[in-house]
């Protein structure tokens, strides 16, 4: 695993010479920072296919996960305002009373959920200093056995990645680069992974290498740092994250 990530990183450095204007990719399959969503969306008709390696601290429920895993997702942007994403997160069998013993330690199932974002105001729209404003939701339904119309997402139900949010983003030209300031109010009322309150993030793209986007955020729960590296005219994006400065997650995205 470490060798694979090293090869991808070296490839990004060697090939990442094309100037781009990319957005960071949230580990949940939506445009954002690292864990925290922001108010940005992709360009109209953008199609993204991505996958993440997620450390166990990045996951919302220890009883269901409690182990490192992977996810993969499909994301589509419509009308230059709307993002819709479908995310699948792999699950290993474990001795928690649900899985048969033959599945212990093996990837045997996956959690599936949708996420969506509506950008109400674009940055600079109506007024040159106007920040972007967006609202959205992740994992808005729950259920089992084929019943996914249950809206009881709070508490301890199956909607492990549930949250709704209101986000604002604004970018500034500063010496030697472009600075992004992001604020997001999140709410989920979950027992297992509470994300309730105001999160914030800072992104910085240096002028000397615009393929690189440095990120720090607080998602209301943890302080995270990371970077996004873009290559091949922004068709490939590699994301590296240190949750709480020590737990590694990484992503590769194609669009």
Predicted regions, residues:
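Outer membrane beta-barrel transmembrane domains
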Residues: 197-241, 249-253
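Detector for outer-membrane/organellar transmembrane beta-barrel domains
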Residues: 152-219
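Cleavable N-terminal export/targeting peptides
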Residues: 1-30
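Transmembrane beta-barrel domains of Gram-negative outer membranes and organellar outer membranes
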Residues: 24-164, 169-175, 208, 227-229, ...
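Active-site beta-loop-alpha junctions enriched in small/polar residues
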Residues: 89, 138-140, 184-188, 219-221, ...
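A generic structural motif
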Residues: 79-81, 222, 245-247
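Glycine-centered flexibility motif
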Residues: 28-32, 37, 45, 182-186, ...
